[in-house]
């Protein structure tokens, strides 16, 4: 889960890291109250989860409450790269002398954590690494030992931080690691980490991503979810313990196992190229226990998407045998009818693996005109795409 800048700033502040005083506003009047509380010159920043705010006019320096209200009025509702601005963060300004960069992240490619540090902050770190790689230090972090003072000092020294800020940077590096671990983050990035004219260090920006799989350890993280941006179908699926991601397509996908579902997305996309460009409408993994109730919940979620014109149910029987899955599909359609959910869109079902023949016989015996059984994955994808194209 990616946080807004103001949420990252608040998280840093809770962990004792030095940030600018400020607040977040959703209306011009709230912006006025914050500006009056802070006093003097402030900066008004659009809160969107995308870069390029400054160039788009989403960052403004203001003097006094009236100008802050005017600029907040301009920014709220602004569209920045397809993201509508609903909130602005207002902070005091800082007299910046130098800008540095510091981050911790989960390095999935190398299965470790990584610290990236540079004295060339305030710009895209990837650009810095490409143009002047000697200015960027990348240090793998052992999860068992973490970042203590000695490790932090080694990184700070290697990155070439000036002597006058070295001790402060070491302290921030240790505290930032503690925050990274405590919050189960996959990224904490400070760009810039600024040296002020007075010689102190401030975290002027906050980019934070949290591991949603660790949400059970962090009930407070629920408050960080941007409810306005949550897809209602994804939320409904989450409440039913289903792994669902909405996509932009017409063929609903239900499968058991993430790998199989990913492969199903591919074959449907390929088949769709021959049928008007139809595409997968979702990712939905019902897991290993495809009971009637689970299948009914899955079908209900998929069919709640009005863009779906056909559904491809792709199941490979393993621990859960295909005959159990077939019974689940038949019973699921009956359950949906009982719930008042009139199912009218066709289901293309492919069963393979454990007890596949028995499962196919159950589907054939159901005599449900909505169920079309196809025994190969490619053939089923072709049929589902064809039906979706015909129903568009």
Curated annotation (Swiss-Prot):
Residues 9-236 form the ATP-grasp domain. Mg(2+) binds at residues 191, 205. GO terms for biological process: succinyl-CoA metabolic process; tricarboxylic acid cycle. InterPro entries: ATP-grasp, ATP-grasp_succ-CoA_synth-type, ATP_grasp_subdomain_1, Succ-CoA_synthase_bsu_CS, SUCC_ACL_C, Succ_CoA_ligase-like_bsu, Succinyl-CoA_synth-like. Coiled coil: none annotated. Pfam families: ATP-grasp_2 (PF08442), Ligase_CoA (PF00549). Keywords: ATP-binding, Ligase, Magnesium, Metal-binding, Nucleotide-binding, Tricarboxylic acid cycle. It catalyses: succinate + ATP + CoA = succinyl-CoA + ADP + phosphate; GTP + succinate + CoA = succinyl-CoA + GDP + phosphate. PANTHER family: SUCCINATE--COA LIGASE [GDP-FORMING] SUBUNIT BETA, MITOCHONDRIAL, SUCCINYL-COA SYNTHETASE BETA CHAIN. Belongs to the succinate/malate CoA ligase beta subunit family. Succinyl-CoA synthetase functions in the citric acid cycle (TCA), coupling the hydrolysis of succinyl-CoA to the synthesis of either ATP or GTP and thus represents the only step of substrate-level phosphorylation in the TCA. The beta subunit provides nucleotide specificity of the enzyme and binds the substrate succinate, while the binding sites for coenzyme A and phosphate are found in the alpha subunit. This is Succinate--CoA ligase [ADP-forming] subunit beta. It comes from Salinispora tropica (strain ATCC BAA-916 / DSM 44818 / JCM 13857 / NBRC 105044 / CNB-440).
